[in-house]
Amino acid sequence: MHTAPARRRSHTGTRRPICAPRRSDDRYLIVNADDLGADRGTSRGIIEAHARGIVTSASLMVDMPDARAAMRAAREHPRLGVGLHVSFTAGPRTVDLSDARAVRQELERQLERFVELSGQEPTHVDSHHHVHCRPELAPLFVALCRARRIPLRGFSGVTYLGHFYGQWEHGKTDLQHISPEYLMSLLVGIRPGVSELACHPGDRDARFDPMYDWQRRFELDALTDPRVTTVARRSVRLINYRDLGRLLPAPPRRAATYSPA
């Protein structure tokens, strides 16, 4: 699930093959759906947003009720990259974020649980409510992900864009920010390089978060809108985190500064 950043103007395509070296003006976009496995409605919406729309990547909550079924469904779509959505604050297990040892142990456990469910390492790691960006936790995440050579959201040379979200100030719903028109404006504004656009689609049965369930259907509608897929095809090259090795051959020596825009 997403914690909305401060509202700022963002400058953020479809699956064209990546067969040539990256040029300085190339625009690559990962469209990642958070909360895979949270429940059946959320998982179905994510799979549909990939099959019929522009979603190229998802992040799995390994301890949630639909995790195993969601992973099975994802395997039927080989171009859908699946990463780990680390959760310390939702689900059956919670962690005291002030206890660094407990945080590390739980992160390692969730990584191993992901491998158990999928048979492979996650394409990337991100986290519920962006806890991996907390100053006291970021070094732990960075060190563990580097040791396993797994990209970490916001710390792997990919610009993170969190503006496609329907809830902003004081929890007020703003459907304008999950409309097809707004999504198209983000796509045409993508800057050169590699970017990630976060999203949270679901179908009408999504029940993961009472504060943000029915909005997921509006996200799904936008992500699968034919106008959006056309604009994406013309504006960017859609990729997932598996493609980073061809585009960013060496990880940055220092962790990039995480930015919500």
What residues fall within each predicted segment?
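Terminal accessory/targeting
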Residues: H2-I30, R40-S118, H124, H132-A261
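DG-centered beta-turn motif at the end of beta-strands
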Residues: A33-L36
